[in-house]
Amino acid sequence: MVQLLNPDMVSAGPPGRTGHIAVSYENYVLVWGGYRENPGVASNTYFSGAELYIYSCISEKWYLKKNGNVSFPPGMSGSTAVVIDDALYVFGGYGYHGQGCTNLLFKFDLETFIWSAVEPEGVPPIPVDKMAGWQYNKKFYVFGGFGNPDTGPSHEFQFVFYHLLWRGWTNQFFEYDPKKNTWSKPFTTGTLPSARAAHAAAVMQGKVYIFGGRHDVHRMNDMHCLDMEIMHWSGELPIKGPVPMGRSWHSLTALSERYLVLYGGFSQNNIVLSDCWRFDTVNHTWQPIELPFEKPRLWHCACLSIFDEVLIFGGCTTNILDLERTPEQATDIVVIRTYPKSLFRSCVDKTIDFPCNIWETLPHNIQSVLQLRFGYRSRHLIGS
């Protein structure tokens, strides 16, 4: 049993933000970090590292947990995060007390709701943001990112320097083992993807798929695969048929044992995208998905819910590079379903419209769900 969610923690939801992290955990989606644009102000506001927003897929409510102790990460954007054994690990990002990128690692215990700084042994990745991260066999993997020139021990990876910002793109690949508390560079075969940032990755059937991202002045549309069992890179996968346009700041979500869902991003021509594609990992084909809405998003986050829905939160809805206009940031949740909402959930939605005093005529399990939706009782983060 993990930390109790109190009725007092019910929230209207996170403010609009960009560059945050979001991960699935049991029946929940955890949202942390990111920043917001301030109209008419040259600087951005980074959200407090003490705040963790929790979205319940069952009650369809937001909860806010503010960390009361003095130990919590600084507000950052472009971090990456995974959940391993009831702990949220957050790595890297930008905005650390105005010092640019960081390679710090933090842990949030999901049973005690306490943050702690992790100090692993071994040589860490160079400080970056906008990298991709994933969990496999209870280890944390990090690939790529946009960061500071390497000033530490020699690394064997590509670094493409961007002189205007004194930073650059990298294809560094590192593994963090929580049991050993060590960083290491896994031995791999095959051809690594080129240096990139603002790409996306998804794990499926023992393989991780990496799509797109920015490399120098190019926003790419290549797909790469790493077999996590034998640590072999595929090189760029040959694709049959149409391919999504090149992009960065998009999301890629494993939907089943076969398909990945790509959503949104930022095009080569600085257009905020709202298209959705499904990638078949068996046949290596892309198929566009027609959605009943058009909601442009970039630098958003996407998670798979317990109901096999892709939940997309946050991100910019307008050109993030337009200096004459403050970018607009989304506060709603975009839901992508590959099949209709279940009859049970639809009935619950309809039943809520009826007076509460007739709920007593319903079975107890349905009453419990309705009470969760209305917030009448305290709640636990229950295992799925």
Which ranges hold each PLM region?
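Cullin-RING E3 adaptor/co-adaptor recruitment helices
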Residues: Q3-L4, R36, C301, I306-S384
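Conserved short beta-strand element of beta-propeller blades
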Residues: G13-V31, L52, P74-V90, L105, ...
